[in-house]
């Protein structure tokens, strides 16, 4: 697939200005030049042209926001001055696997003031004596050359773009944790409500027991009252019998007195 068609497919019905990343690896470039890429990609930040048969970058449009450019496994042997002219904010440049032989071919990169990382793996220039010292001296703005700084300390795996992605992932995890904490809080509140309901049930049962106790006590009092009434009735009957007995006794005494007369 040629480069023009690949760019058309990568757009996916978007306008060039809406594209921030463009990967054209392994497509075919006619005459070893960039084709189909225009200055309309004003917001492009990442461009990958790995193994597309490039010989020159002379057709590269001006991309003011481009930060990372992948040009590994091509046949570029010079003409890097176009990079400084067209890509003023470039920070990462990968030229591994190209035909760069001399330190002098890298001189145009001095104008890339924002350049922090340069990769030249598998280029003949890396075989020169004092290669690393010479490149760092030529390009003092560099922080990392072939993945290591001046003190041979390895570069971190993540660059600014990857860090941004990591921050988004951390935010999502934080939201999930907050959501889990909220759910736990809701469960605790629900448990507290259940405990309150149980306490209310226990109190209700105790109240019922108290009422039942009062009823029983009242019932016993009623029984005691009935017994008292029975005793009172018995006493009344006894008094009546005694009075009847006394009346009969008086009557007999009166009758006896009459007979004596």
UniProtKB/Swiss-Prot annotation:
Report the PTM annotation. Some Glu residues are glycylated by TTLL8; a modification that generates a side chains of glycine on the gamma-carboxyl groups of specific glutamate residues. Directly cleaved by caspase-3/CASP3.
Q: Where is the composition biased (Basic and acidic residues)?
A: 244-254
What is the first-listed, main subcellular location in coarse terms? nucleus
Give GO cellular component annotations, separated by semicolons. Answer: cytoplasm; endoplasmic reticulum; nucleus; perinuclear region of cytoplasm
The ranges of the LRR repeats are 16-40, 43-64, 65-87, 89-110
Q: Which Pfam families match?
A: LRR_9
**What's a Gene Ontology MF term here?**
histone binding
Subcellular location per UniProt equals: Nucleus
At which residues is N6-acetyllysine found?
Answer: 86
Q: What PROSITE patterns does UniProt report for this protein, alphabetically?
A: LRR
Region named Disordered: 149-261
Residues where Phosphothreonine is found? 254
| Keywords assigned by UniProt, alphabetized | Acetylation, Chaperone, Leucine-rich repeat, Nucleus, Phosphoprotein, Repeat
- UniProt motif Nuclear localization signal: location: 249-252
Question: Which positions are tagged coiled coil?
Answer: none
| Domain LRRCT, residue spans | 123-161
| Function, in words | Multifunctional protein that is involved in the regulation of many processes including cell proliferation, apoptosis, cell cycle progression or transcription. Regulates the proliferation of neuronal stem cells, differentiation of leukemic cells and progression from G1 to S phase of the cell cycle. As negative regulator of caspase-3-dependent apoptosis, may act as an antagonist of ANP32A in regulating tissue homeostasis. Exhibits histone chaperone properties, able to recruit histones to certain promoters, thus regulating the transcription of specific genes.
How would you summarize the oligomeric state and partners of this protein? Interacts with histones H3 and H4. Interacts with KLF5; this interaction induces promoter region-specific histone incorporation and inhibition of histone acetylation by ANP32B.
Name used for this protein in its record: Acidic leucine-rich nuclear phosphoprotein 32 family member B
User: What does the record give as the organism's lineage?
Assistant: Eukaryota, Metazoa, Chordata, Craniata, Vertebrata
